[in-house]
Amino acid sequence: MIALALLLQGSLPDSLPPKPAVAPSAWLSLIGAYASDHDTLYVYEDGGALVALLRPRAPMRLAQAAESLFTFSGRGPYDADRIAFRPGEIQVGQVVLRRLQMGPADGGQLRLQPVRSVTELLRIDHKLTPPAETGAFLAPDLVEPSRLDGTIRLDIRYATTNNFLGTVVYSSARAFLQRPAALALVRAARVLRPLGYGILIHDAYRPWYVTKVFWDATPPASRWLVADPARGSKHNRGAAVDLTLYDLATGAPVEMPSTYDEATPRALSDYPGGTSRQRWHRALLRRVLEAERFTVNPSEWWHFDFRDWQRYQILNVPFERVR
């Protein structure tokens, strides 16, 4: 109770440092991942300095010697003392590493070419039945968090063409969760509000037939990106939410280490790259939601599962029929 009271007064969650300064804009084009045939070297900003990380070595701070030349704080990777940045690559000693294109630009979206017509799949899969389940499940009680707290906003990508299939999938831009999960999200929003942040939901309850559409439309080699409809997903149970933070003062989404729905290492919940502020935003979101007993998906910093998801069964109710 004491910790919650402190949060409601605008204090940061335990173990979270103060909000870092914005990284110098000149460094943003240098930050990223660079690869040779054998290694991947990450360049990121931490505490107002550029840092180079080549695992299993410890991170090494860089000092700027010229516009595109930095020196290591000690003997660097490949026994080098400096790192030179060039368009599309870096040189560390005698080793040249090419810059990896890790994902879409800020605000962009992963795209796949559907192998079947999404419109046709929506018509067909809508009529199918989810896999049978047995157990003592709780009765479904789906509610809309945005109706419980006015600071919770929506950017439902599957109700637009700005999603991985490039096609509208949802019939309306709505987000439902089982009531206990929705109330937990409202409590999280109340914690974030004094800190100047609100919650922006990208997806929540997903009818099972939509999961089937995703599976059927996705190329087989890329199906690791989507849930298997034979097992259903936590989204189908109304117990998972995809979300980020937005700035209450401007209404703009905050910067995170990756874009939403990005299928690259930047999406990992512990990805070390990016800027201090991006990682701080990610950590703030995670700390506040974990305090409400959500669990982050290690592969997707934006995806959180509610603690009691196993107690709810797979649902296939269209948004318009949710009562």
Annotate each predicted stretch with a short phrase:
Residues 47, 56, 66, 158-160, ...:
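A mature extracytoplasmic/lumenal domain signature
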Residues 9-120:
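Peripheral terminal and inter-domain segments
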Residues 208-214, 304-311:
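Beta-rich nucleic-acid/ligand-interaction surfaces
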Residues 28-40, 289-293, 300, 305:
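K/E-rich alpha-helical interaction surfaces of small helical-bundle regulatory domains
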Residues 5, 25, 34, 43, ...:
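Sterically constrained small-residue positions within well-ordered secondary structures
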Residues 105-202, 217-299, 308-323:
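Extracytoplasmic cell-surface/polysaccharide-interacting catalytic and binding patches
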Residues 1-9:
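Bacterial N-terminal signal peptides
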